[in-house]
Structures are given as structure tokens and as C-alpha cells.
């Protein structure tokens, strides 16, 4: 009954209106398991290849080549394979036999495309859970060898800037984390209340237009100073109890190693506001001193290992320094970051690396190093895989946008269902969001 009998892919659309790949895996028990691939706006240069068509259709962003690779190469090759054998399907068949492309950071998926491979990997994972007749999150936990399921703390991205919004704010995300909640359900209540209170604060201060939302449902008021964004959050969370702040700077979007940094979104920029990497480091330290910040993601360029290590050494005890573009969910880059003490948390994005198996390995390495893990991707579909992934791997944190826009709420609603299903066994990460479980 676990045998794969049919695989089909198609082109669908993500939350930005860009084409993406969806795959369906049918097993001998007649069940069809479907999965769609997410994408990102600010992508790291070390991510596995996302195969796009080029040309004029969809401004070059079509994925019909990747779809063809599933329908004509991957699909036929996996007929008869056991859907519960996730590692064998990912590594032995799709990577080694079918794609075979490698660079200094491992399997790069340049022949078939990480989006083609990942669509099948995700759908196979869902099929494996179906065959075993267990929830997807439990199947993922079993694949990882994780004995304890944990509901993550949601990091609500409530103010958008950078590549996620049309305002002048350089830093990309300002988030709230309800670590003081006793359950995921209560965390949602806190997040929603802060979100609506923030909307009222922004509307009163900047006008109705300022409550327009960005890519992830967060507000995008036309503010230019990053500190102003933090002040807005400080005001909004004052009445909400134990809620703390996280930031995604996405510094690779406006900064290069050995060059000065400037606000890339400032019109008629004359260079007068450029600062050095050391000055930027000190700016983060001042933010941490002044605001209840517990997480800073991508504080420097993806190649600036030196300043990542400096910042982690100086404030890593009280703040998690999250590697996104730095790590791209790649086990080999995680290994390097552990050795160099460049950060102390992994941003888990399955599409950066292109398979369930490699994602699990990156998480296990991170946990063994004592790191935190946060699951995420911004260019989303209605697929809720990431919700089950965060519970099954006990990441402790999930970042999937504001409590706004249906592709965002689909994940949060799935987490509410999982918590309800677990009943008295449900555990919410809360204040232990950085280390919710022992390494597995």
C-alpha cells in the first residue's frame, strides 16, 4: 500500500502571484497527497537552484521546466518506490541518480531544480504519513527521531519593510513573539490583539493609508527610521502582557562586506548616511538595550562571517542571532557557522535547500549545537506543511507572517487544529522557544 503509483506536477501561483510548482503523489491505497513549493522575496545567493523558465511569460518566472522535470523524469523514476522511505527517495533517487549536480556546499539541484525536487519531497512526506495513518507532524517527528512534539511560538511579522513592502524602511521585518502565553491558542489571541491595536496606533499617527499591508500581512507605514518601527511595537505591546520583539534585517539586500552600508530605499541617496559594519553592530546593541528584543535575523551580509561572529559573541547570550541568507538551511553552511560561532539560531526554509531530508539534518545539527530554530518562508501558498514541520521537529518558533491574509492564517489555523488534536499532551514552547526540547 506504500508503493507510489503516480506522480503529477502542475504550475500554480503563490501569494505574490508568481508561478510555483505543485506536485501530487498517489500511492497504492488510492490516496493522493498534494504539496506546493514556497519561495522568497529576499533570497540568499547560496540557496539551491530555483528553476525558472525565463523568457517573456510571467516576466520570466514561469516554472514549466520544473513541472516537466517532475512529470517526465522524477515521476516515472519513483513509480513503485515506498513513500515511507523519505531519505532514500530524496538522497538516493532524486539527488544521486536523477539530478547529480554538486557544488562546494553539497547537492545544488541545478539539473532538475530545487523547486521540482522539493515539490515531490514534500508530497512524498505527506504520502508517507497517509500510508502510516498518522498525522503529518508525527510522521515528520518519526523521520527526525524526535520524541517530543512542541507547538511553536509564532513570530508575527506586523511591520513590513525591505523587500516585503513599498515604504522606505530598510530593515525587512519587525515581529512580536507572545512568549508569555500558556498555549498556542492564547498566543494567537495575544498576537491578534496586538496586531489590531498596532493598526489603530498607526492609523492615528500616520493616517488610513499607512495601514496598508505588505507581502506578509504586516503594516507598511511610510516610515524611514528603523527605530521608529521599534517604537510603534513598544507602544502596541505595552498593554499585551509578556510579548517580546524580533527583527529580520535582511542586511544582504542593502549591504556588502567591506563596503559601507546605506539605506537602499532612500530616494536621491547622496551617501551621507552610510555606516560601517561595526557601526551597524553597535546600532543593534543599542536596540537590544532599549527594547525587549530577543531575536535578530540576518544582521549582516551573507558573506560577512566576521561581524556575525562578533555580534554573536557580544550579545548572543541574551539574543538569538538567526542565520537565514548566511545558512540557507544548508547542513554544510550550518556546520561552518557552528565552528565559527557565527550565529546561534537557524531559519528553517525547506525551499532554500530543496528537500525534507536535508532540512531535518540542518535542524538536528542546529539543536545539537544548542541553537534555536525558526521555521519560515514568505512567498507562500495555501499549503500548511510548514505548520506540521514546526511541530514535528519541535522548532520552538514559526514565522509565517501577520495574522492577516489567508495564506498566512492557513498555517496558524493548522497549528490550532494540531494543538486541539494533541489535547492534554499539547506543549507550547513559550519562554523556552530557543531550546524547547533536548537535542535528538
Swiss-Prot record:
Pathway: Carbohydrate degradation; glycolysis; pyruvate from D-glyceraldehyde 3-phosphate: step 4/5. The keyword Cytoplasm applies. The keyword Ribosomal protein does not apply. Substrate binds at residues 164, 173, 297, 324, 399. Its EC number is 4.2.1.11. One of its GO terms (biological process) is glycolytic process. This is Enolase. It comes from Alnus glutinosa. The lineage of its organism: Eukaryota, Viridiplantae, Streptophyta, Embryophyta, Tracheophyta.
Amino acid at each position: 500500500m506504500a508503493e507510489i503509483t503516480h506522480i503529477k506536477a502542475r504550475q500554480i501561483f503563490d501569494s505574490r502571484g508568481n508561478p510555483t510548482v505543485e506536485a501530487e503523489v498517489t500511492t497504492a491505497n488510492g490516496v493522493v497527497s498534494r504539496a506546493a513549493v514556497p519561495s522568497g522575496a529576499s533570497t540568499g545567493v547560496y540557496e539551491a537552484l530555483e528553476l525558472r523558465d525565463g523568457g517573456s511569460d510571467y516576466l520570466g518566472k514561469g516554472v514549466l521546466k520544473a513541472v516537466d522535470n517532475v512529470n517526465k523524469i522524477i515521476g516515472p523514476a519513483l513509480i513503485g518506490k515506498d513513500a515511507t522511505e523519505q531519505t532514500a527517495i530524496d538522497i538516493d533517487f532524486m539527488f544521486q541518480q536523477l539530478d547529480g549536480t554538486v557544488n562546494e556546499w553539497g547537492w545544488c539541484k541545478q539539473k532538475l531544480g530545487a523547486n521540482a525536487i522539493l515539490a515531490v519531497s514534500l508530497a512524498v512526506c505527506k504520502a508517507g504519513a497517509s500510508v502510516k495513518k498518522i498525522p503529518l507532524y508525527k510522521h515528520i517527528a518519526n523521520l527526525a527521531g524526535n520524541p517530543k512534539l512542541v507547538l511553536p511560538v509564532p513570530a508575527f511579522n506586523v511591520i513590513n519593510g525591505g523587500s516585503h513592502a513599498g515604504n522606505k524602511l530598510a530593515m525587512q521585518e519587525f515581529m512580536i513573539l507572545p512568549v508569555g502565553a500558556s498555549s498556542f491558542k492564547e498566543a494567537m489571541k495575544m498576537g491578534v490583539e496586538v496586531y489590531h491595536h498596532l493598526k489603530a496606533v498607526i492609523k492615528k499617527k500616520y493616517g488610513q493609508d499607512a495601514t496598508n499591508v505588505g507581502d506578509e500581512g504586516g503594516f507598511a507605514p511610510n516610515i524611514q527610521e528603523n527605530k521608529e518601527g521599534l517604537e510603534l511595537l513598544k507602544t502596541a505591546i505595552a498593554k499585551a502582557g509578556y510579548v517580546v520583539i524580533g527583527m529580520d534585517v535582511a542586511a544582504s539586500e542593502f549591504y556588502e562586506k567591506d563596503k559601507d552600508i546605506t539605506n537602499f530605499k532612500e530616494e536621491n541617496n547622496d551617501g551621507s548616511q552610510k555606516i560601517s559594519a561595526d557601526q551597524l553592530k553597535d546600532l543593534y546593541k543599542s536596540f537590544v538595550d532599549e527594547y525587549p528584543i530577543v531575536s535578530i535575523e540576518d544582521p549582516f551580509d551573507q558573506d560577512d562571517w566576521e561581524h556575525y561572529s562578533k555580534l554573536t559573541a557580544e550579545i548572543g547570550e541574551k539574543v538569538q542571532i538567526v542565520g537565514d541568507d548566511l545558512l540557507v538551511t544548508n547542513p554544510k553552511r550550518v556546520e561552518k557557522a557552528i565552528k565559527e560561532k557565527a550565529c546561534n539560531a537557524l531559519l528553517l526554509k525547506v525551499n532554500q535547500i530543496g528537500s525534507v531530508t536535508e532540512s531535518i539534518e540542518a535542524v538536528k545539527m542546529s539543536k545539537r549545537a544548542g541553537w534555536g530554530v525558526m521555521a519560515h518562508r514568505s512567498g507562500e501558498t495555501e499549503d500548511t506543511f510548514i505548520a506540521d514541520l514546526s511541530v514535528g521537529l519541535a522548532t520552538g518558533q514559526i514565522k509565517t507572517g501577520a495574522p492577516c491574509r489567508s495564506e498566512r492564517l492557513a498555517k496558524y489555523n493548522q497549528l490550532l487544529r494540531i494543538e486541539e488534536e494533541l489535547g492534554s499532551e499539547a506543549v507550547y514552547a513559550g519562554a523556552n522557544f530557543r531550546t524547547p526540547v533536548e537535542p535528538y
